[in-house]
């Protein structure tokens, strides 16, 4: 090398602050750094597909403390409750809070006691507009193909999808 050049090296002490985003594949997907396969249906909005084992789930017999810990660990507000490969309910922060408030021992109760079993299920071929009434009811959309659970779509998933499509 014949000419002098300056080199700037950024050496963080850890990756747990701003660089932590680079370690999070879901953040990278949402922000367009990874390409995702497009299907032309509601699968394009599912951030954590169940078929790829990306969906964080609970079983009906799991304890509410387990649900709370998973919500905290993965920074999510709701979890599908699966009996094998069949979705039987959904549990969100409000369900847990309302169940345990006033009696913290209830964290040891089973998920099946506190979960919601009235589900807003949409077929994968439903139009994106079909999500709006689900969200208007304060629910999360459960996407299926026939009887097969594909994943969840939340309000933020729809917003991220719309942002990615913006010019």
Identify the function of each model-found stretch.
Residues 87-90, 128, 149-152:
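Glycine-rich acetyl-CoA-binding "A-motif" of GNAT/NAT acetyltransferases
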Residues 56-75, 81-83, 100, 120-139, ...:
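The conserved cystathionine-beta-synthase
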Residues 40-56, 107-119:
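Bateman (tandem CBS) regulatory domains
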Residues 93-101:
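Structured interaction and signal-relay segments at domain junctions
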Residues 15-16, 149, 158:
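Surface-exposed, flexible loop/turn segments at secondary-structure boundaries
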Residues 1-52:
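Phosphate-binding loop/pocket of nucleotide- and phosphate-handling active sites
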């Amino acid at each position: 090398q014949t000419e002098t050049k300056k080199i700037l090296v950024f050496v963080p002490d850890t990756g747990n602050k701003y660089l932590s985003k680079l370690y999070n594949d879901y953040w990278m997907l949402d922000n367009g750094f990874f390409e995702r396969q497009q299907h032309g249906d509601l699968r394009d909005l599912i951030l954590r597909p169940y078929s790829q084992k990306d969906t964080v789930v609970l079983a009906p017999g799991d304890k509410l403390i387990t649900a709370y810990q998973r919500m905290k660990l993965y920074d999510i507000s709701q979890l599908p409750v699966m009996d094998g490969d069949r979705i039987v309910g959904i549990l969100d922060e409000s369900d847990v809070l309302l169940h345990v408030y006033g009696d913290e021992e209830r964290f040891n109760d089973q998920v099946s006691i506190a979960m919601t079993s009235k589900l807003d299920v949409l077929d994968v071929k439903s139009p994106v507009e079909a999500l709006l009434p689900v969200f208007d009811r304060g629910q999360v959309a459960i996407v299926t193909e026939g009887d097969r659970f594909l994943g969840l779509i939340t309000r933020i998933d729809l917003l991220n999808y719309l942002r990615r499509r913006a010019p």
